[in-house]
Amino acid sequence: MRTDKIRKYLIPNIPYLFILWACLKLGTAYRLAAGNDFAHMFFVGRGVDYAVCLEGSLKLKEISYIHSEAYAAGELKHGTISLIEQGTLVIGVLTQSELYEKTISNMLECKSRGAYLMGLTTYGKYEIEDQVNFTVYVPKVDEHFIGSLAVIPLQLLGYYVSVAKGLDVDKPRNLAKSVTVE
C-alpha cells in the first residue's frame, strides 16, 4: 500500500518538490541579487557548465530585461574581461569537478577588477564560500545530468529579479510564442 502511494503521488511530483525546496532554500541568495541594481550580469563556465550559463543568461534577459551574457570562462582574457568593472555581477557555474579550479581562477580575476561574485556549485564544495560573495548549491548528481539540475537555480534567479523589478514574468515584452508547421 505504501509503495503504491509513493508511485502515485511522490514520484510524479519530484520535479515540483525540488522547485519548492529550491525556492525556500535559495530565496535569500536571490533576494540579495534582486535587491542590487546590477546593470550587467555575466555568466561564466566551462564545458557543460557553459551551456548552463547560456540558458541562465537567456532567461535573465528574457524576463528581467537586464543585459547579461554568457562566456566560456577560458575566453575571458580575450576581451571579455575588459567589460568587468566595479559592481558587475559575475555568476560562475562550477559543477564539473575537473574544471572547477580553472573556472574559480577565472572568477577571481573578475573579482580583482571589482566584480561581485556568485558561485553555483554542488554541495560539498564549501571552500568556494571564501572566494565568492555568495553561493548557491545544488545536490551532487552524476555529472552527465548536472546541467539539467543546475539550470533551475539560474531560472529562479531570473524570476526573482523580475519580480523584484515589478515585471510580469508570465508575459515578457516583445516575445512571441511561435510554432512552425512543415
Which residues fall in each region the model found?
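A SIS-like phosphosugar-recognition module
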Residues: 1-182
